[in-house]
């Protein structure tokens, strides 16, 4: 490989891939291009920065220069890739271009901001860069509106509440975590958030935002409104696919790849939040770790398929943490819920009484690994 491997992106997926390649090959040319600084930080920490009193710069674990030195690669930070010429094997930015033998897209996903009037007033916390842009406003805010009651919205609501802020969480659904589990399972966390003082506006819709002299006026359905100091969009992520689309790659929800992480072009691969693996978008740490291990082998000449085991998803709400696994969103499961003071175990079984999913909380989380072994893969 005279031109080596070019990676676009610098998040967890890109870094896992670099580390796995270097475990197997110390000399193959590696080039990493990204729009950000390429400094390393732990993205899940963004759900806890306010209660921890952390500034954006406090999150940095390793500088770009240290990363380049440790893993022998060329870095191009603050660089927007504009085009990929797949036929010529060339990646282009406004001022530069790079030849590649193999190309990897690790472009991540961007926060979805609901298309309502005043949407430009909404903040997002999907990267260190985004937090840096709004950290002063968030630290100073007394009243915070979080739009979206999913995993990230629930984590942020608890964190801001622990920091002493007045928190309102709004969602169209009738319960929090509605896309992950049924209400009878999420109700324990929902009750805890309410106990802590989070004002839940469920089955409610944000209709618009407007700047006022004393804050931001949020207009809701049913002729309601509230005034806050900051509004955060936590309404999910959208895989970054524009670059892949322009390159002529197959796109669905994400950049479509097979079990080998290969796109519709034989020399272009994708992993992480931007990838759709055999129809599944899996924006969680464990599948990304496993993808990085497999893709490193395949880029170096192997032909190893990705095989994903049953995997845990962790909801980092410290006052009532949850682990879940399996097909928790399936509508046809019967849920057997065992609740005690020290925690909950909820088992989702099918018509044949086969365990298909589970959710565990607090001290009962230690039972997760035993349950995980009984889930079908």
UniProtKB/Swiss-Prot annotation:
Highest taxon above the source species? Bacteria
Which UniProt key words apply to this protein?
A: Cytoplasm, FAD, Flavoprotein, NAD, Oxidoreductase
* Pfam families named in the record: Pyr_redox_2 (PF07992), Rbx_binding (PF18113)
Question: Into which EC class is this enzyme placed?
Answer: oxidoreductase
In terms of InterPro entries, this protein maps to:
FAD-bd_OxRdtase, FAD/NAD-bd_sf, FAD/NAD-binding_dom, NO_rdtase_NorW, Rbx-bd
Q: Where in the cell is it found?
A: Cytoplasm
GO terms assigned for molecular function: oxidoreductase activity, acting on iron-sulfur proteins as donors, NAD or NADP as acceptor
- For whether the record's keyword set contains Oxidoreductase, the answer is yes
Enzyme Commission number(s) of this protein: 1.18.1.-
The record's GO CC annotations read:
cytoplasm
The cofactors required by this protein are: FAD
- Pathway involvement? Nitrogen metabolism; nitric oxide reduction
| Reactions accelerated catalytically | 2 reduced [nitric oxide reductase rubredoxin domain] + NAD(+) + H(+) = 2 oxidized [nitric oxide reductase rubredoxin domain] + NADH
Similarity field: Belongs to the FAD-dependent oxidoreductase family.
Q: What does this protein do?
A: One of at least two accessory proteins for anaerobic nitric oxide (NO) reductase. Reduces the rubredoxin moiety of NO reductase.
- Protein name per its UniProtKB record: Nitric oxide reductase FlRd-NAD(+) reductase
Q: Gene symbol?
A: norW
């Amino acid at each position: 490989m005279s031109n080596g491997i070019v990676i676009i992106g610098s998040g967890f997926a890109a870094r896992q891939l670099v580390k796995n390649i270097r475990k197997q090959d110390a000399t193959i040319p590696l080039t990493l291009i990204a729009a950000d600084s390429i400094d390393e930080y732990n993205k899940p920490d963004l759900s806890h920065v306010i209660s921890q009193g952390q500034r954006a710069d406090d999150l940095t674990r390793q500088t770009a220069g240290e990363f380049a030195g440790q893993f022998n690669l060329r870095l191009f930070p603050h660089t927007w890739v504009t085009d990929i010429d797949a036929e010529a094997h060339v990646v282009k930015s406004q001022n530069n271009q790079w030849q590649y033998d193999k190309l990897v897209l690790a472009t991540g996903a961007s926060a979805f901001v609901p298309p309502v009037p005043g949407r430009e007033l909404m903040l997002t916390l999907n990267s260190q860069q985004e937090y840096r842009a709004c950290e002063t406003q968030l630290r100073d805010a007394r009243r915070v509106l979080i739009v979206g009651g999913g995993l990230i919205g629930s984590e942020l609501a608890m964190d801001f509440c622990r920091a002493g802020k007045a928190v309102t969480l709004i969602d169209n659904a009738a319960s929090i975590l509605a896309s992950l589990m049924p209400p009878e399972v999420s109700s324990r966390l929902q009750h805890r958030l309410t106990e802590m003082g989070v004002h839940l506006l469920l089955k409610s819709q944000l209709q618009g935002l407007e700047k006022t002299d004393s804050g931001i006026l949020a207009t809701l359905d049913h002729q309601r409104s509230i005034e806050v100091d900051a509004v955060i969009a936590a309404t999910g992520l959208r895989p970054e696919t524009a670059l892949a689309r322009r390159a002529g790659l197959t796109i669905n929800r994400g950049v479509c790849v097979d079990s080998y992480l290969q796109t519709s072009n034989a020399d272009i691969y994708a992993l992480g939040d931007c990838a759709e693996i055999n129809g599944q978008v899996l924006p969680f740490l464990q599948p990304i770790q496993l993808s990085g291990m497999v893709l490193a082998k395949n880029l170096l000449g192997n032909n190893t398929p990705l095989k994903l085991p049953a995997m845990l998803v962790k909801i980092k709400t410290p006052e009532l943490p949850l682990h879940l696994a399996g097909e928790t969103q399936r509508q046809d499961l019967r849920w057997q819920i065992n609740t005690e003071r020290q925690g909950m175990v909820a088992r989702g079984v099918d018509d044949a009484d086969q365990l298909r999913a589970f959710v565990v909380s607090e001290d009962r989380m230690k039972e997760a690994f035993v349950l995980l072994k009984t889930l079908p893969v």
